[in-house]
Amino acid sequence: MTNESSKIFDFFPQGLICLDLETTGLSPLLNRIVEIAGIKITPEGIEKFSSLVNPGITMDARNIAIHKISNEMVKDSPPLSEVLPKFMEFAGNLPLLAHNAQFDLGFIIYGLHQLKLPFPHNKVFCTVKLSRLVFKEFAHFKLGILAEKLKIQVKNAHRAEDDAMVCLEVLKQGLLRASEKDLSGSFLFHLDDFHIIDNFELKDHLKLLQEKIDSQGIMRIKYLGGSRKNEPRPIRPLSLLPLPQGNVLYAHCLDSNLYKMYNLNKITECIPATEEDLEKYKKIEEK
């Protein structure tokens, strides 16, 4: 066993699961899983889980270009109702880790609710958060960039099993530098924090969010939170995510040029972007 691998058991004595998903889009509340993979590392050794998933819809060319999973590849694959229970059995109660875990676990959480499956007490950790804490010399923390910086071999980027393995390698190197405080800083939630949340319907006045997430377009929202209560603010919506405190919009705020979370219950209106908003985004992209 390498020093990197043995370090895992200092922090996770029972072992852990590194997982990754490929999906039809960025929003767990709107899109679907097309591949699930997990790497289980325990004191007994390493096990792998990997399965394509038939999403029940036709994927567009933009999705396929990212993960290279075609409609032909998934047409005879099992549906999520068959794959997710098997994956959860594989995972057991071990801690779950993923790169940008809120995204991947958002899809898992939504699937558990839709299929009325039990919510185990797994701890969930994010290797993006851990990387920000321990690789302070890096400016960017996308999985591919970390793999390059840390000299991790990547066979098939944007395929679930390979990305899960890269996530594991990032974790191994991160734990060589990490303290218990760093690990605490990468903790997100327990999976069963979500067991009583089941309202995933998007209200009518928020439907423009779905359109703009799909097109990666610009729009405005009126929001009851923050210092500019109910004033229109330009955003680029990226994803809708379930959280224990309620569903949120993850978006790029153009005024601050920061990525923020917005509680869906506090968004009072969705408005088309102005020409000024589009010009502002163009200038941000050009920097």
Language-model-derived ranges and their functions:
Residues P95-F103, F107, G111-L112, K142-D198:
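Acidic, Mg2+-coordinating catalytic module of metal-dependent nucleases/exonucleases
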Residues V124-F141:
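Short alpha-helix plus adjacent loop in nuclease-associated cores
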Residues F200-K287:
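Core beta-strand-centered patch of the WYL/Sm-like small regulatory domain
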